[in-house]
Regions:
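Catalytic activation segment of kinase domains across protein kinase-like and atypical kinase folds
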Residues: 2-4, 8-67
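Regulatory N- and C-terminal appendages and interdomain linkers associated
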Residues: 41-256
Length: 256
């Protein structure tokens, strides 16, 4: 659920990493079109736009490399296009592998089309309720293949409860084709779905304590917690929670 905020060409490295993080965040409530820069009113760098922006940036890079690819300009363009055309499949393959892991699914037990649809429908349900991204996957990693009392905690995240309950039934139907048991599946999901993320309101609290009061203890506690974000730690429940309305960081710019 990470949003760079301003993922333009100078913030994307040829090493395959985005850099220069300013108005960035790990999402709290999920929205396809969530942005994290107050000046991004058109949603150019929205969460769902990031894959396309990645390709756009690579096209700009390819344009600068055309003189090195071939002496003939049209031939150079063809070479660049041949490589750029592989981006979509490579991205979608990596995305599906990551999302399957988050949902405890394996490639051999379901088709790519089916599993892509299952993931997409979950994101739609999350979007409709603005369900917390991290907590949703964390709760799913605690559920069994059969309904149990743990379902209720996950359902509380969804204002559109029935939509999530319907999706949950489809997910469990898909799980029946998996060969691993609940314990192994849950362990795998918990290894890729963090319990804690650096939520913006917690980062802001650490900054305010340090700058306003010279108190770095809030920063050190948060920093220590995030060294092992996949393991639930006693007494740290508050770090799992999304912000209260008055805690939300609503204005972010480059440099914040």
């Amino acid at each position: 659920g990470f949003i760079h905020g301003v993922m333009n060409t100078d913030n994307m490295s040829v090493a395959g990493e985005t850099i220069d993080y300013g108005p960035c965040a790990f999402m709290d409530g999920y929205r396809h079109e969530r942005v994290f820069s107050s000046i991004d009113r058109q949603g150019r760098y929205a969460y769902s736009s990031q894959p396309g922006i990645g390709l756009w940036n690579l096209i700009r890079l390819a344009e600068t490399l055309l003189p090195l690819l071939a002496i003939d300009g049209s031939e150079a363009v063809k070479i660049a296009e041949r490589y750029l055309e592989t981006y979509k499949d490579q991205y979608e393959s990596a995305w599906l592998a990551g999302m399957r892991a988050k949902l405890g699914l394996t490639a051999g037990a379901g088709s790519d089309e089916e599993d892509r649809g299952l993931v997409g429908s979950l994101l739609d349900v999350m979007d409709a309720s603005e369900a917390d991204f991290t907590l949703t996957f964390d709760h799913l990693g605690r559920l069994g293949a059969d309904p149990s009392g743990h379902d209720e905690e996950a359902c509380k995240l969804f204002a559109q409860r029935e939509q999530f309950v319907d999706w949950l039934a489809k997910w469990r139907e898909r799980l029946k084709r998996e060969t691993q048991g609940d314990a192994a599946r849950q362990a795998g999901m918990q290894a890729v779905n963090p319990v804690y993320i650096p939520r913006n309101h917690q980062i802001e609290a650490a900054i305010r304590a340090a700058e306003d009061r010279g108190d770095f203890s809030v920063f050190h506690e948060l920093h220590a917690l995030l060294q092992d974000p996949y393991v639930e730690q006693p007494g740290k429940e508050r770090f799992r929670l999304p912000p209260e309305p008055e805690e939300m960081v609503t204005r972010t710019f480059c440099g914040t």
